[in-house]
Amino acid sequence: MARLKEIYRKEIAPKLKEELQLANVMEVPRVTKITLNMGLGEAVGDKKIIENAVADLEKITGQKPIVTYARKSIAGFKIREGWPIGVKVTLRSDRMYEFLDRLLSISLPRVRDFRGLNAKSFDGRGNYSMGVKEQIIFPEIDYDKIDALRGLDITLTTTARTDDEGRALLRAFKFPFRN
């Protein structure tokens, strides 16, 4: 079992149940999935960019990402319907907890000029989104073998009903929020 999953079950869930004054342990908010998305607008003319992004995301997550395609043609962005424009991967269960553990303990401390995560990046339903400017903060990526610095979006989907419940859950996981 993943280290963070065990910590959640033994320490975080009972503490949150008391803190949020919930009647049942099944009401306690939990992280259900983590979605990593890499938007590749520059990949319009080059298939190699997509292949490199897939390889990077696969190294980071240990899971094969899927390529996302444009749903509509947009002349302003010079894209056609059906062209590949990004890659994404959804992590659940043990892989999700292992990724979260690596993100919090290894990757975020490696971010240059890191002052903490924005505590206001919740969506109103307890889900949290954050962006990473460069993929080299992950130790799985070899700096010498990357072709370009690419950012990615990380979305944590939780069962929390409100932002405050979601914030309490992520604080219990020791998320480094700014304020």
UniProtKB/Swiss-Prot annotation:
What keywords sit in the KW lines?
A: Ribonucleoprotein, Ribosomal protein, RNA-binding, rRNA-binding, tRNA-binding
A single GO molecular-function term is: structural constituent of ribosome
Question: GO biological process: what's one of them?
Answer: translation
GO CC terms: ribonucleoprotein complex; ribosome
* Gene3D superfamilies per the UniProt record, alphabetical: 3.30.1440.10
Q: What does this protein do?
A: This is one of the proteins that bind and probably mediate the attachment of the 5S RNA into the large ribosomal subunit, where it forms part of the central protuberance. In the 70S ribosome it contacts protein S13 of the 30S subunit (bridge B1b), connecting the 2 subunits; this bridge is implicated in subunit movement. Contacts the P site tRNA; the 5S rRNA and some of its associated proteins might help stabilize positioning of ribosome-bound tRNAs.
Q: Which PANTHER family match?
A: 60S RIBOSOMAL PROTEIN L11-RELATED
Supply the name of the protein: Large ribosomal subunit protein uL5
The organism named in the record is Pseudomonas paraeruginosa (strain DSM 24068 / PA7)
